[in-house]
A protein has these predicted regions:
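A conserved position within tetratricopeptide repeats
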Residues: 34-35, 50-53, 89, 123, ...
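Register position in tetratricopeptide repeats
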Residues: 55, 74, 108, 142-143, ...
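N-terminal leader/linker segments that initiate helical-solenoid repeat arrays
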Residues: 18-67
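TPR/TPR-like (Sel1-like) alpha-helical repeat modules
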Residues: 28-38, 141-165, 171, 175
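Alpha-helical adaptor scaffolds
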Residues: 59-126, 131
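Alpha-solenoid helical repeat scaffolds
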Residues: 97-101, 131-135, 151, 165-170
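Bacterial N-terminal signal peptides
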Residues: 7-15
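Boundary/linker segments of alpha-helical solenoid repeat arrays
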Residues: 41-43, 57, 130-131, 160-172, ...
Length: 182
């Protein structure tokens, strides 16, 4: 019986690894497409990336909890959203999107340092997370770290060249810097 259980466990773990590799390969391909596609096509690729990020690789219950938290955000129940995202993070500390969702809510609550801490974790797990990088830009604007904000938006442009908001934000930040020196 022990032998059967061990064989089953090894098979199960190999399937999880296979799913993870498949997901990583799909993301890698989408990021290549994101770099070369223009506006409309790139937007479709972006949506596919968000779909993968927002879907837990192995646990649909965590995906459902993340969506529940997102619903609380849409309803402006930010404290409840934080609770749910924190619960999801405790259950899987390696799911970048759970950290990203909580970082977003911390930003919305004006808790910029906590937001940045979560963004750091997102980027540790998924360095190409253009949403977290854009959020990092917003956090740095609030903290008046304008040069860091510009760097964040430049990184977004490297990952997602056809996204227009980074250019707009960089121009706005440059205006803020000019106003400081006047």
């Amino acid at each position: 019986m022990k032998k059967f259980f061990l064989i089953f466990l090894l098979y199960f773990l190999s399937q999880l690894s296979s799913l993870s590799n498949e997901r990583d390969n799909k993301l890698n391909q989408l990021f290549i497409e994101l770099k070369v596609n223009q506006s409309n096509d790139a937007f479709i690729v972006e949506q596919e990336i968000w779909k993968l990020w927002s879907t837990h690789p192995t646990d649909m219950n965590l995906t459902a909890r993340l969506e529940e938290g997102a619903q609380f955000v849409r309803n402006q129940q930010l404290s409840k959203a934080i609770e749910i995202f924190t619960e999801v993070i405790k259950l899987d500390q390696n799911w970048a999107e759970a950290w990203n969702k909580r970082a977003t809510v911390f930003y919305m609550m004006g808790k910029f340092k906590q937001s940045q801490e979560d963004i750091d974790k997102v980027l540790e797990l998924e360095a190409r997370h253009f949403g977290a990088l854009a959020g990092q830009g917003l956090v740095n604007i609030q903290l008046k770290n304008y040069e860091k904000a510009i760097l964040s938006y430049q990184q977004v442009k490297e990952i997602y060249p056809s996204m227009q908001s980074p250019e707009i934000m960089i121009r706005r930040i440059e205006e803020l810097i000019k106003q400081q020196t006047i």
